[in-house]
Design a protein with these regions (language model features):
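C-terminal motif of bacterial Sec signal peptides marking the signal peptidase cleavage site
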Residues: 21-24
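Bacterial N-terminal signal peptides that target proteins for export
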Residues: 2-13
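Glycine-rich, aromatic-bearing surface loops/beta-hairpins
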Residues: 157-219
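N-terminal glycine/threonine-rich, aromatic-flanked beta-hairpin/loop signature
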Residues: 80-130
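Generic short beta-strand segments
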Residues: 75-83, 117, 141-149, 174-181
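Short, hydrophobic/aromatic-rich segments at coil-to-beta transitions
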Residues: 70-73, 110-116, 135-143, 170-172
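Amphipathic/hydrophobic helical signal segments and adjacent flexible N-terminal regions
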Residues: 26-89, 204-219
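Short, surface-exposed coil-to-beta transition loops
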Residues: 95-99, 125-129, 152-160, 172-174, ...
């Protein structure tokens, strides 16, 4: 009887240790990403306008619920691919923008991340959270809505995609649609609502870099 009691005590103690160690197994580390509740992830086909997805190109949208783990800073140089406006101020396709675009993705869960962006013309970066990811293998697509930052600035539906490599993001594509402006006065220099822009990186690789520090965040 004593041996049976001792065995039960050892078994109970082992189960207690297992339960106590469980939370540490669920924490995010370099090799572990929490599994999302699928209800938390809006489908890209319902979240973004269909005409934006069509203009971006189905071949450039990477579908799947197993995107790569992304924790990277990279920079892209945009080349104009297409735009759905005849505004004379818009450069023709093939024109490379002189403005560098900086990106940082901090993946918090399998399909949810914090995204930080800045252009070489800005003094601080924009923090957008959450953004959503879809993809498989090393191919991914990030998609989100960007709210107006100032009076007269637009709300955008945005996506960008590519293939994660050790050097950055290969086959980088970026597109957005102007959904609305946040006040009744639209600047005369602004592009009209529903305009869609699509860009690619000028040499096909948005290069890995280190650009971010806390002082760049607008508080």
């Amino acid at each position: 009887m004593k041996n049976k009691s001792k065995k039960r005590l050892i078994l109970a103690f082992s189960m207690l240790l297992a339960l106590l160690s469980l939370p540490s197994c669920l924490k995010k580390d370099d090799t572990t990403i929490l599994i999302n509740n699928p209800q938390d992830i809006p489908l890209i086909t319902g979240f973004l306008p269909s005409d934006l997805l069509a203009q971006f190109g189905e071949q450039n949208v990477h579908f799947g619920d197993q995107p790569p783990v992304i924790d990277m800073e990279f920079v892209s140089q945009h080349e104009y691919v297409s735009v759905t406006t005849s505004a004379p101020s818009f450069p023709p396709p093939g024109t490379v923008s002189p403005i560098a675009h900086y990106h940082k993705i901090n993946q918090q869960y399998l399909q949810i991340a914090e995204y930080l962006s800045m252009s070489s013309e800005e003094a601080y970066c924009n923090v957008i959270s959450p953004v959503y990811l879809t993809g498989h293998g090393n191919d991914f697509t990030v998609y989100y809505h960007e709210s107006p930052q100032t009076d007269g600035s637009p709300e955008h539906a945005v996506l960008f995609s590519g293939t994660l490599t050790a050097d950055g993001v290969k086959n980088f594509m970026y597109g957005y649609k102007i959904l609305r402006y946040n006040d009744s006065v639209v600047p005369i220099t602004a592009y009209p609502v529903n305009t869609i822009f699509v860009f690619k990186d000028r040499d096909g690789l948005a290069e890995k870099t280190n650009w971010y520090n806390d002082s760049l965040v607008h508080r």
